[in-house]
């Protein structure tokens, strides 16, 4: 199992050199050597060693990136991401994984003790991304674009089968007569769901077919292949209650903003641009040559995007 990693914070890019390659690190006075400087703060060798003890399985680049991000995002969003908020999030994830929590942490090179500061950094980055989305992306043009493909809530039976033959037989039986339809609905009562075009639990192909149906109508057999598992499923949809979005976009403004938010959170170029913005704002400078390219994945992506 893997915990969701926001943006590009927890990258697994190894530094070209390990901790021991830092020039002068073997001397007794090296602890105060600057690795990264920024407005009002500094990351020294001693900070890196401390971070390495807490996250022994993380590569050096990741340690330095997260130390930097924690500092720069705390300046703007530290009051938004409180200890109470972090504890609540940690508890939620722990409850979600249950008895598998410890093993899931181990797979990520984390412990219960280190997971809290890890999650805090994740939440700080998310706060920065959300702020940028709110300030720059909820434009009329973006809302209108999201509106074009948006469909409001519908309620339907969404039934999946592992073979096309099984799905075809189930569909034929359901469409045969009223008794067949009633049997289909009773058998698949737990498959009655409400969803809209932003739902992630219903495949896109199924949504497209469902939104064309009138109340009481059945779809043809719909084939959908999971991008994560590669498995193909065959779906049948019976529409219970459809809906029309009408012409009033403002009625669904919140939903459309969520569409934009989800899209931008998954846009690595946008996320890199947000990080690059705060790196520049805080005048983050890498002093140690071994880590000269530490933030290039963010700044280069941002520059490439802005030049288009």
From Swiss-Prot:
The keyword Isomerase applies. Keywords: Cell membrane, Isomerase, Lipoprotein, Membrane, Palmitate, Rotamase, Signal. It is an enzyme of class 5 (isomerase). A lipid is attached at residue 25 (S-diacylglycerol cysteine). InterPro entries: Foldase_PrsA, PrsA_foldase, Trigger_fact/SurA_dom_sf. PROSITE patterns: PROKAR_LIPOPROTEIN. The keyword Methyltransferase does not apply. It is found in: Cell membrane. It is a lipid-anchor. GO terms for biological process: protein folding. GO terms for cellular component: plasma membrane. GO terms for molecular function: peptidyl-prolyl cis-trans isomerase activity. It comes from the Bacteria. Residues 1-24 form the signal peptide. Its EC number is 5.2.1.8. A lipid is attached at residue 25 (N-palmitoyl cysteine). It catalyses: [protein]-peptidylproline (omega=180) = [protein]-peptidylproline (omega=0). Plays a major role in protein secretion by helping the post-translocational extracellular folding of several secreted proteins. The conserved PPIase motif is absent in this protein but it still has foldase activity. Belongs to the PrsA family. This is Foldase protein PrsA. It comes from Lactococcus lactis subsp. lactis (strain IL1403) (Streptococcus lactis). The gene is prsA.
């Amino acid at each position: 199992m893997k915990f969701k990693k926001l943006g590009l914070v927890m990258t697994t890019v190894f530094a070209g050199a390990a901790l021991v390659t830092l020039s002068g690190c073997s001397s007794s006075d090296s602890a105060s050597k600057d690795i990264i400087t920024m407005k009002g703060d500094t990351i020294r060798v001693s900070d890196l060693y401390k971070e390495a003890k807490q996250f022994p399985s993380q590569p050096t680049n990741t340690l330095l990136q997260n130390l930097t991000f924690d500092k720069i995002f705390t300046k703007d969003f530290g009051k938004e991401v409180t200890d109470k908020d972090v504890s609540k999030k940690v508890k939620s994830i722990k409850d979600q994984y249950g008895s598998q929590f410890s093993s899931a942490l181990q797979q990520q090179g984390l412990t219960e003790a280190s997971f809290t500061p890890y999650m805090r950094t994740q939440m700080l980055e998310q706060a920065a991304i959300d702020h940028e989305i709110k300030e720059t992306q909820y434009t009329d043009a973006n809302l209108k674009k999201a509106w074009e493909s948006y469909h409001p809530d519908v309620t339907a039976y969404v039934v999946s089968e592992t073979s096309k033959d099984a799905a075809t037989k189930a569909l034929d039986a359901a469409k045969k007569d009223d008794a067949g339809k009633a049997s289909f609905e009773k058998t698949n009562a737990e498959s009655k769901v409400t969803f809209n075009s932003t739902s992630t639990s219903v495949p896109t192909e199924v949504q497209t077919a469902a939104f064309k149906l009138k109340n009481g109508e059945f779809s043809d057999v719909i084939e959908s292949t999971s991008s994560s598992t590669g498995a193909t499923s065959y779906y049948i949809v019976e529409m219970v209650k459809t809906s029309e979005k009408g012409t009033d976009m403002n009625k669904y403004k919140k939903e459309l903003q969520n569409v934009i938010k989800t899209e931008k959170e998954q846009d690595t170029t946008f996320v890199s641009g947000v990080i690059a913005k705060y790196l520049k704002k805080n005048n983050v400078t890498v002093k140690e040559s071994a880590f000269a390219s530490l933030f290039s994945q963010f700044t280069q992506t941002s520059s490439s995007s802005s030049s288009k």
